[in-house]
């Protein structure tokens, strides 16, 4: 019995602040000026564990098992302040930021197009567990063996996005001037698949082997995206739930589920000699997929069946 493995832990914390002052030429006679600051704080924590177990109960049998586990947690925050002007503000971004609460005291109001203040938080968890196994058994005669290979993978992830945005259009009427858009988006995702392959190899003459193989795979993926419009006085720190709930935005919410059934059966002949090699066979691949999709008034199910037939022939000869 042989065992081995590794465990890795990683933590990243990035704090980035960027400032910009730009001019965009709208036409040959007019320009648009923009000053902005972006502040981002991104944190990532991850844990990965891999193991390998090999067991040989006798000289004819080999068993290998490779389990693995991964966990990742993200926390990404950003704050953006941008200011757009019809004339050169003639002030630095820092000076404009300092006067943001009373910007017209620094720059004539007729030169201010709009100001945008936006804060966002995206946090998520991703848990993955999977593994593979292989069992090989030699059956007496050299070259005769049977092999089983299996794999499994399961992923469960969730993502939450919180955002508050306030845009002030200085040149609009008092009723139209302020635009507030607060949103909460939840996106849980579930993926899992498993597969199994059986292979049998039979020697039929010197250097020649006949091989039979069958493979089956099942995959399923489900994702729900729910978008909520939150009240104007809502703040990110309040979170979502309890008294802090919003109105479901059906046009921007959707759910999708994919299901796959894949089969593959192979028959092949391999003949290997000192100066030549021959590989000929045929593969049959029936497949079925199903999609269930919902968005707003759309609720649909699509099923697809495919059958692939693939013959192969490969002959090589060494002349020297």
Label the predicted regions.
Residues 1-320:
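Primarily recognizes Gram-negative and organellar outer-membrane beta-barrels
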């Amino acid at each position: 019995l042989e065992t081995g493995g590794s465990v890795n832990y990683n933590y990243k914390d990035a704090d980035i602040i960027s400032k910009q002052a730009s001019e965009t030429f709208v036409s040959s006679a007019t320009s648009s000026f923009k000053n902005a600051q972006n502040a981002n704080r991104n944190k990532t924590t991850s844990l990965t564990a891999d193991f390998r177990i090999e067991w040989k109960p006798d000289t004819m049998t080999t068993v290998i098992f490779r389990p693995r586990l991964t966990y990742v947690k993200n926390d990404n925050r950003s704050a953006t302040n941008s200011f757009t002007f019809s004339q050169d503000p003639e002030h630095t971004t820092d000076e404009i930021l300092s006067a943001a609460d009373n910007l017209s005291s620094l720059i004539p109001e007729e030169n201010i197009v709009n100001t945008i203040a936006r804060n966002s938080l995206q946090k998520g968890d991703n848990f993955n567990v999977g593994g593979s196994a292989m069992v090989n058994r030699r059956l007496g005669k050299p070259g005769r063996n049977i092999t089983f290979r299996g794999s499994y993978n399961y992923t469960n992830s969730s993502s939450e996005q919180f955002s508050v945005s306030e845009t002030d259009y200085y040149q609009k009427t008092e009723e139209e001037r302020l635009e507030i858009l607060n949103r909460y988006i939840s996106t849980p995702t579930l993926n899992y698949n498993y597969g199994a392959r059986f292979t049998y190899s039979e020697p039929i003459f010197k250097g020649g082997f006949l091989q039979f193989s069958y493979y089956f795979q099942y995959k399923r993926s489900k994702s729900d995206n729910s978008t909520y419009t939150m009240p104007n006085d809502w703040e990110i720190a309040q979170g979502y739930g309890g008294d802090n709930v919003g109105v479901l935005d059906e046009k921007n919410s959707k759910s999708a589920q994919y299901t796959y059934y894949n089969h593959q059966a192979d028959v092949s002949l391999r003949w290997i000699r000192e100066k030549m090699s021959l590989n000929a066979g045929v593969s049959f691949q029936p497949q079925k997929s199903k999609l269930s999709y919902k968005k707003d008034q759309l609720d649909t199910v699509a099923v697809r069946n495919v059958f692939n037939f693939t013959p192969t022939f490969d002959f090589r000869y060494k002349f020297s």
